[in-house]
Amino acid sequence: MQEKSKPVDNLRADAEKIITRAIAAVLPDAAVERALKGKTFLGRVYLVAAGKAAWQMAQAARACLQDNFCGGVVVTKYGHVNGEIADVACFEGGHPVPDENSLRGTDAALALTEDLTESDTVVFLLSGGGSALFEKPLLPLAELQDVTNQLLAAGADIVEINTIRKRLSAVKGGRFARHCAPAQVFAVVLSDILGDPLDMIASGPAYPDSSSCAQALDIAKRYGLRLSERAWALLAQETPKTLENVETQITGSVRELCAAAAAACEALGYEPMILTDCLCCEAREAGSMLASIARTHARDGKNLAFLMGGETVVHLRGKGLGGRNQEIALSAALGIEGLSNALVFSVGSDGTDGPTDAAGGIADGETAQLMRQKGVDAVQSLNDNDAYHALDAVGGLLKTGATGTNVNDVTVLLLRTAE
């Protein structure tokens, strides 16, 4: 049963409901339980979870794994461990750039899964963020951090970044599964990459690598990466192309996130349209595009919702603070100024957006004007990649806290019937 239409000033209340319902639909607990339901593992059972959703996935899995359980390791982002899990050691590390604690957690996982037998099973829970959090570098950590920072600053997408990182790691590109052999690996994957390419999610620690050394070298040259001789040599080496000890199941994706958001929009009286669940472009361009759609349909006399899912990129031009979702909102704010019935929000399903405490940003037709009243130059803030401070000045930051899931971002334009 649909809720009655609300006045324009309730657009933000609608946005909050949509965000809450969409994220709730892709939480990993039930998905992990479904993946493990009816599974019987012979011999000893070990649990390794890596990524921003690792703690929540591990908690659900631990409740299912009772017989022959021999221990586990969780490696997740700072602030994402929400308590103890019986017989499971929990580590927090750096993201999006790995740090010493990322390495400590990975070392613990490698030690736990060393010298296993054919009758043993490693239940491997993988989610977005695993590329930074699950790491055993073949280079000094400082050098690996520098390579990652160069790629991020150049605007490389997640596939390109992972193609490079898996060749500089002892666990990525199928190498963790090879380490676990001859034990069986049952991998449960929460997908954060468009199209669900298993070899790219968290750089594919338990999946054969489909990328080539030629592709890695091309990426490095195209972005002008400054690399040591050792790094160039590693990029020229191939990764495992076959793994016979792994079974993989995908659970959760951006497609499900968009579908849940669309259902929430419909329940609130909007006519939803999912424009794409494979969004991959410059963040500010996505914001401008939605603003153009808003101006086209603002007077249609309907309650409309246009949705996009995916992961945009930000080419750093300034030294400000922000994230891709905040930049979408700031860009949209400039384009929808004066439209009293329009609102745009963009949020990361994991509850984080860039190196900030915000999950994303929200803007309506009054946001740009409010910024001017606060002495904030929205255009300059966008050029400086300083969306965080611009939005913060007008209450435009979305802060959900860590959600425990990670299936990319969802961006929504809401249009209410103009009054």
Write out the residue ranges for each language-model feature.
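Glycine-rich oxoanion-binding loops at beta->alpha junctions
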Residues: 75-119, 159-160, 164-165
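Internal gly/pro-rich beta-alpha loop/helix module
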Residues: 140-226, 235
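Short beta-strand segments
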Residues: 48-50, 73-76, 124-128, 187-193, ...
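Internal helix-turn-beta structural module
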Residues: 330-419
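N-terminal amphipathic/basic leader segments beginning at the initiator methionine
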Residues: 1-44, 48, 56, 81, ...
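Active-site segments that bind and position negatively charged phosphate/pyrophosphate groups
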Residues: 269-346, 354-355
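A glycine- and small-aliphatic-rich helix-loop capping segment at beta-alpha/alpha-beta transitions
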Residues: 60-68, 87-90, 110-114, 137-150, ...
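Accessory alpha-helical/coil subdomains and C-terminal extensions
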Residues: 165, 183-186, 208-289, 293
